[in-house]
From Swiss-Prot:
UniProt entry tagged with the keyword Transport: yes
Protein name: Probable translocation protein y4yN
Cellular component terms (Gene Ontology): plasma membrane
Compartment(s) of residence: Cell membrane
Amino acid sequence: MYLSPAEIQILLHAAIELVAAAGLGAARALGIMLILPVFTRSQIGGLIRGCLAIAFGLPCLAHVSDGLQAPDPETSLIQIPLLGLKEVFVGVLLGTFLGIPLWGLQAAGEFIDNQRGITSPSTQADPATNSQASAMGVFLGITAITIFVAAGGVEAVLSALYGSYSIWPVYRFQPTLSTQGAVELFGLLDHIMRTTLLVSGPVVFFLGLIDISMMMLRRFAPQFKSGQLSPPIKNIVFPIIMVTYATYLLEGIKLEITQADGTLGWLDKLLK
């Protein structure tokens, strides 16, 4: 059975529309995966991320495919790629909101290591992300990702992804921006710093007490070299502090990560 040229053209047109719809449906999910630490580990390759993005976008395929009939055929070659870029940007925005607790916790690890005398030049690159990171930063980062997944973080990602279409639809280029949205954006940056200080605060406090003790000891014994002995003492006491603090730390991490359910609220405040 042979197909006529008209039927072949119809099939090709349908195939192109399907590919375009699948690409637009997966673009927002792909944007999330480009920035959310859960998906940026080197063990998750580009092929896996691409397949996951397409799978996450399948429920929206019918809606996106119906909307492809609206653009003018003469300008669709320009509109569709621009829509794809816009969708990736929205995904990056969502990934930023979802990743704030994870980045805050990793920054807390960096802050703790800096306080106990382990600075960046002496640290090795994180083998999972090929980026510069301290030992405690890597540990808290991996712990945060594990708790994020175990506490239903993937469900929160999907909920934010699908709910975002009602706030910023696929075929709307420009969002609704306001001054309040800019204030909310700075509030999110403040949230990262607040998380960092709250998580690292107790550990840094005890390490600071060691510094103060060393300075007082040097005042009464000038021959005592506190600058050389302070880092070893900190590294000896540090495991004891972390074992004592571990239970409260894990509860705090879990509480912070479960706030990822408010991603849609943040996006709505930012755009409105």
